[in-house]
């Protein structure tokens, strides 16, 4: 099974349990780091901070279900956490949600002589996002985005 399909299947299995516990699933990833596999889920609650106890509640519920369903054949570590203040933006839903907020966007390759841009996310279109930086609107094609993060406010 391809990784993308596995992640989609895992999201379909995990999202209802996360929701049942009173949280939203922000993002899920299955990665290999230093010869170890990790299933990472990032959870949130609208207008509330995520505590260690929140992560524990979701982790226990997911662990029980994953032991029964056994969707991952390799040994792996389950990690549940908050996406944090400087959360990664992965989808159009994430970008749209944070229009008007400060973001940092790194590019896969140079764009108009720049490697990245930091500014206010102004708009999200089908194939690009628009970031206002120092009074200029910079159009960033989505296929040029290497990483995008919300710049958290404390």
UniProtKB/Swiss-Prot annotation:
Q: Which SUPFAM superfamilies match?
A: YhbC-like, C-terminal domain, YhbC-like, N-terminal domain
Q: Which residues form a coiled coil?
A: none
What's in the keyword line of the UniProt record? Cytoplasm, Ribosome biogenesis
Subcellular location(s) per record:
Cytoplasm
The record ties this protein, via Pfam families, to: DUF150_C, RimP_N
Highest taxon listed in the record's lineage:
Bacteria
Give any Gene Ontology cellular component.
Answer: cytosol
Keyword Cytoplasm present in the record's keywords: the answer is: yes
Q: Which PANTHER family match?
A: RIBOSOME MATURATION FACTOR RIMP
The entry's function note states: Required for maturation of 30S ribosomal subunits.
What family does the Swiss-Prot or TrEMBL record give for this protein?
Answer: Belongs to the RimP family.
- Name of the molecule in the record: Ribosome maturation factor RimP
Taxonomy-wise, where does this protein's organism fall, top ranks first? Bacteria, Bacillati, Bacillota, Clostridia, Eubacteriales
């Amino acid at each position: 099974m391809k990784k993308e399909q596995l992640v989609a299947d895992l999201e379909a299995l995990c999202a209802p349990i996360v929701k049942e516990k009173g949280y939203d699933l922000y993002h899920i990833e299955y990665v290999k780091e230093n010869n170890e596999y990790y299933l990472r889920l990032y959870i949130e609650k609208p207008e509330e901070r995520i505590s260690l106890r929140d992560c524990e509640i979701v982790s226990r519920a997911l662990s029980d279900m994953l032991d029964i369903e056994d969707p991952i054949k390799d040994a792996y570590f389950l990690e549940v956490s908050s996406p944090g203040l400087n959360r990664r933006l992965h989808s159009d839903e994430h970008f749209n949600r944070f229009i008007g907020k400060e973001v940092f966007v790194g590019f896969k390759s140079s764009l108009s002589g720049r490697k990245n841009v930091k500014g206010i996310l102004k708009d999200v279109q089908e194939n690009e996002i628009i970031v206002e930086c120092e009074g200029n609107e910079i159009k960033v094609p989505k296929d040029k985005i290497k990483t995008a993060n919300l710049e958290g406010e404390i």
